[in-house]
Amino acid sequence: MSVSETRDLFDRWELVWHEDRHDLVPACVGPTYVRHEAAGERTVTGESYAAELARMKEARPGVRVAVYDHVFWDNRAWFRFTFNWRDPETGKPRTQAGMQSYRIEDGKLAETWIVLQPEGSAWPDAVAQERWTSPPPYKR
């Protein structure tokens, strides 16, 4: 898979997350999507994961994913990010830092490994990328 194709996939995936474009889930997630998480490994479908995202967004209103670094190579992608949202009861800002890598198959997400820091964590970067696939805001 080319870097351009991978970038296009994650541009669509960002629309799913930030613009609630759940109609794009079938273009982003394969027939099965294996997720390796702190609670263990599980396999979901695009449809079930879209429903899960909707529930998560209810629990974390206005959630945004600020990406600080990413790498695309072959059929893999890696991101360093922070979830940002407001506590639904207090309205106070909440954060949670994490890293996630993906395996892509037939142009769609097939498998992911995600590691999250505790709630309240955030990366020390002053500025995030403009979009998930934009160049980092610092010179290499």
PLM-predicted stretches and their roles:
Residues 47:
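Hydrophobic small-molecule pocket/channel-lining residues, especially in calycin-type beta-barrels
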Residues 1-32, 43, 130-140:
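Short, low-complexity N-terminal intrinsically disordered segments enriched in polar/charged residues
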Residues 25-27, 36-37, 65-66, 112:
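Short, hydrophobic secondary-structure boundary micro-motifs
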Residues 32-44, 56-59:
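A short gly/proline-enriched turn/hairpin at secondary-structure junctions
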Residues 5, 9, 50-140:
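A beta-strand edge to alpha-helix "cap/lid" segment located at domain peripheries
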